[in-house]
Amino acid sequence: MTAALILCALLLASCASTPTSHTTVLGDWMADNYNRQLSSFMVISLADEPGIRVKFESIMVNRLKQEGLHAIASSDIMPVDQEINRGTVKAAMADKDIDGVLVSRLLGVERNAIYVPPSPDNSLETTFNLAAPLVTSPGYMEHRSVVTLQIDLYDSASEHLVWSLRAQTVNPPNVTEVMDKISNDVVKDLRSKGLI
């Protein structure tokens, strides 16, 4: 009986879906006629959870530094529990010689389940063996999570939005991997636009 239960559990596990994770840049925008190259950034994450805020800012700062740029996390110069608004940000970066402010925000998290129907066996063996079942792989449920983030860049002198990127991650494996991927996408896009 125990062996049958184990075999049944293994068969069910083999049918379960393990969806893959991927991040896609949904779009970007840049202000017309903005031609300033920036070299010093303050990174702000508007995450509700302090741990996620600190982690994202740290990953983005490190990625910018890999490009030879100066970057500082807001959580390094502002208390984590301090409200983030125009006044507190200006005060925190007053003596820091910051060119641009990168602000990330979570736009949404969507969770859904998708039924993947059974697939037919189209092998030659099945074609000639009419007694064989037509369906060899059962249907299953695939659970998906979709996380959408937006990263905005403000010119610190004019305080105007000069660039924005929206990215979406399907089935994020963990926060760190998502942030690593998005920080690479941000740097790649900033470089392609001549902003760094």
Q: Language model features by range: what are they?
A:
Residues 38-113:
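N-terminal segment of the mature soluble domain
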Residues 84-153:
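Surface-exposed short loop/turn segments
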Residues 26-31, 55-69, 119-121, 193-196:
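Short low-complexity stretches enriched in small and charged residues
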Residues 60-65, 91-93, 120-125, 170-173, ...:
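Short, low-complexity, polar/charged sequence segments that are solvent-exposed and flexible
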Residues 15-39, 48, 136-196:
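C-terminal/domain-edge helix-coil "capping" segments
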Residues 1-5:
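Bacterial N-terminal signal peptides that target proteins for export
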